[in-house]
Amino acid sequence: MTNNYQTPEEAELAFYDAMECHDLEAMMSVWLENDTVACVHPGASRLEGLADIRAGFEQMFEEPAPTMDFTISDTRRQCLGNVAIHTVREEIEIGGQLVSVMLATNVFQKTPFGWRMLLHHASPEFDFELDEMDFTLDHPAPVMLH
């Protein structure tokens, strides 16, 4: 581990910077180096363990794609000893145009080497999708808890 992130916020900023720059090594420096880590990208299977996460970001960064710009807002933070839980709203722009809004949970653990990411889980924001899809339901959908 080359970077010693002094706060979970610093590690989170490095995560989004690495996403924007498609920088695999910077991305991997954010993650905790063990097999308890997990990452869930929207519409994708869960990646478990550092090797799977590396392979997932490697594939994402290798594909020719326009640069994404992230605006993080609506942040909620909770620190419980050596674990920090952040929930955020990710607005993703390509070429200055808003293309997606995600709700994400980022979990960090404090280590002797600084704060490291333990979990990233992102899902589309429901209200944003409904606006974009422009449809109405004939009958209200049942409320389900998972």
Segments predicted by a language model, with ranges:
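A beta-strand edge to alpha-helix "cap/lid" segment located at domain peripheries
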Residues: 2-26, 37-146
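Helix-to-beta-strand junctions that scaffold the AdoMet/dcAdoMet cofactor pocket
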Residues: 32
